[in-house]
Curated annotation (Swiss-Prot):
GO terms for molecular function: NADH dehydrogenase (ubiquinone) activity. Its main location: mitochondrion. It is found in: Mitochondrion membrane. It is a multi-pass membrane protein. Belongs to the complex I subunit 3 family. Coiled coil: none annotated. It comes from Caenorhabditis elegans. Gene3D superfamilies: NADH:ubiquinone/plastoquinone oxidoreductase, chain 3 (1.20.58.1610). This is NADH-ubiquinone oxidoreductase chain 3.
Length: 111
């Protein structure tokens, strides 16, 4: 227990030391060119408005969710035979979510 506490304290001290060294050695030039947006080498004129497509955000979110569910499937499939019930329940849940996304029209690739 003492060794674990020593490792924890050493890790926290090392983490704080690296953070402090990084803070002290970093360049703190907050000029206009440093904090402004880069537009092909020209100085930006006016307010820059970032357009963000919610459609692609939803597609990315669905990809991440289904990707994580596939990883969970792999964990279930390598275990014993009694876990197939939970596998089927999770699979039905995923198919239900996929059907709901299809029903609401969120799987359309054309904007």
């Amino acid at each position: 227990m003492l060794v674990l506490l020593m490792v924890l304290v050493f890790t926290l001290v090392l983490l704080f030391a690296f953070y402090l060294i990084n803070f002290l050695l970093s360049i703190k030039d907050m000029g206009k060119n440093k904090i402004s947006a880069f537009e092909c080498g020209f100085v930006s004129v006016g307010k820059i408005q970032n357009s963000f497509s919610i459609h692609f955000f939803i597609m990315m979110l669905m990809f991440v969710i289904f990707d994580l569910e596939i990883v969970m499937f792999l964990g279930i499939l390598v275990s014993d035979l009694s876990s197939y019930i939970s596998f089927l329940m999770m699979f039905i849940f995923i198919l239900g979510g996929f059907y709901m996304e299809w029903w609401y029209g969120k799987l359309v690739w054309v904007i």
